[in-house]
Amino acid sequence: MNNLKRLTKTIFSCFTLSALLLLAGCETLPPMTDLSPITVIDARQATAWELQGKLAIKTPDDKLSANIYWRHSEDRDELTLTTMLGTTVLTLNSTPNSAHLHIDGKDFRDDNAQRLLERVSGWSIPLADLPLWITGQVGPNDQVIESDSQGKPKQLTNTQTPPPWQVAFLSWQSQSGASVPHQLKLERGDLQLKLQLNQWQALGKPAILVGEQP
């Protein structure tokens, strides 16, 4: 059984178990106590953010759909995939120098999150570039193919590693005061990813009022 089929089976098993146990609601990650919701004019002002949405992965042999929860900051990332009933089936916690993946009841570690996820799941997902695309930004290895009337990217090619990633910004929305993508489609060879951002929240350090102790 390949890695994607194994993960699909894991998600289906968790969904079935959740239904049998009559679980409801969604599991949430523990809060980042050092960060608070903020409003920004431009998504580039947010050095940290959190999102909730849907992720779909498609290959010639299989398909996978899951809820995605992602908290991103300059020095760490916390990514979780869950079933529709909220049961966690995958967590990936990483810093610039370490990564920990928990999947199917097993733990895996590496010093690179993208390499770890590809080794265990078989997905070559551009984790280093996704935070830019999620906030509608263009990276140094990106070539914009088409922009909209407001100058926002509609389609770009990432040429860092062949074959290149083709990224389409299908729709945009206003979240936390800024314009961010609502739907993204990524394609590379026979791998296709679709990401829908249902909620995107900019995060920042809480303001200290005059007279308060730091």
From Swiss-Prot:
Ranges of compositional bias, category Polar residues: 143-160
Compartments it resides in: Cell outer membrane
Residues covalently joined to lipid (N-palmitoyl cysteine): C26
Organism: Shewanella baltica (strain OS223)
Complex and partners: Monomer.
Gene Ontology cellular component terms for the protein in this record: cell outer membrane
Chain residue ranges for the region called Disordered: 143-163
Primary location: membrane
GO biological process: lipoprotein localization to outer membrane; protein transport
Record's signal peptide: 1-25
Protein name: Outer-membrane lipoprotein LolB
Superkingdom of this protein's organism: Bacteria
Pfam families named among the record's database cross-references: LolB (PF03550)
Function: Plays a critical role in the incorporation of lipoproteins in the outer membrane after they are released by the LolA protein.
Keywords per UniProt: Cell outer membrane, Chaperone, Lipoprotein, Membrane, Palmitate, Protein transport, Signal, Transport
UniProt xrefs under NCBIfam families: lolB
Membrane topology listed for this record: Lipid-anchor
Residues where lipid is bound covalently (S-diacylglycerol cysteine): C26
